[in-house]
């Protein structure tokens, strides 16, 4: 089905706006995935703050031109499903990775984060990034552990001095 020029321009503009504000992008091939499964993926994506769209490769190349995601151009082959993470860099990768577990025909092609190209086998790096809240919790745990160790050391030192004085 042919798309009118105005519609193509609108698609390019929409995807370009999504790319400009995105933290990361993941590209996948969704051939053979049922409509129901894709609808479920789109619903989960909305809830996770991820922009998901199937776009023709030529339009996608134009849309990401001038953004940090233009490094994905070589991955735009065959039917392309692109996801842009808006709130957390690992959200799209995590979403696609979970979705791929239940779909044999769903194939993650590549990703881009912070101006770097990530091949399909490197997606785990992006998917396992902690969320902001998880990172803060980990940091607080480290700080709390260090302060409690310091307190125990000072208490042991005090006890040692008291024992020596007595």
UniProtKB/Swiss-Prot annotation:
Q: Which GO BP terms sit in this record? A: translation
What's its job? Forms part of the ribosomal stalk, playing a central role in the interaction of the ribosome with GTP-bound translation factors.
Q: Which CDD domains match?
A: Ribosomal_L10
Which positions form S-S bridges?
Answer: none
GO CC list? large ribosomal subunit
> What keywords appear on the UniProt entry?
Ribonucleoprotein, Ribosomal protein, RNA-binding, rRNA-binding
**HAMAP family reported for this sequence:** Ribosomal_uL10 (MF_00362)
This protein's species is: Pseudomonas entomophila (strain L48)
Q: How does it assemble?
A: Part of the ribosomal stalk of the 50S ribosomal subunit. The N-terminus interacts with L11 and the large rRNA to form the base of the stalk. The C-terminus forms an elongated spine to which L12 dimers bind in a sequential fashion forming a multimeric L10(L12)X complex.
Name of the protein in its database record:
Large ribosomal subunit protein uL10
Hey, which family's this protein in?
A: Belongs to the universal ribosomal protein uL10 family.
Classification via InterPro entries: Ribosomal_uL10 (IPR001790), Ribosomal_uL10-like_sf (IPR043141), Ribosomal_uL10_bac (IPR022973), Ribosomal_uL10_bac_type (IPR047865), Ribosomal_uL10_CS_bac (IPR002363)
Q: PROSITE patterns under this entry?
A: RIBOSOMAL_L10
Q: Which GO terms describe its molecular function?
A: large ribosomal subunit rRNA binding; structural constituent of ribosome
Q: Which domain of life is it from?
A: Bacteria
């Amino acid at each position: 089905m042919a798309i009118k020029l105005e519609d193509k321009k609108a698609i390019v503009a929409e995807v370009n706006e999504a790319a400009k504000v995105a933290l990361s992008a993941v590209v996948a091939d969704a051939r053979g995935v049922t409509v129901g499964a894709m609808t479920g993926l789109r619903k989960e994506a909305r809830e996770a703050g991820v922009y998901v769209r199937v776009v023709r490769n030529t339009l996608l190349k134009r849309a990401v031109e001038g953004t940090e995601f233009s490094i994905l151009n070589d991955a735009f082959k065959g039917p392309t499903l692109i996801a842009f993470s808006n709130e957390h860099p690992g959200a799209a990768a995590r979403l696609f990775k979970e979705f791929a577990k239940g779909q044999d025909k769903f194939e993650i092609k590549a990703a881009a984060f912070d101006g770097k190209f990530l091949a399909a086998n490197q997606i785990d790096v992006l998917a396992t990034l902690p969320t902001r809240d998880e990172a803060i919790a980990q940091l607080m745990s480290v700080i709390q552990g260090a302060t409690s160790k310091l307190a125990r050391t000072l208490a042991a030192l005090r006890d040692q001095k008291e024992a020596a004085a007595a």
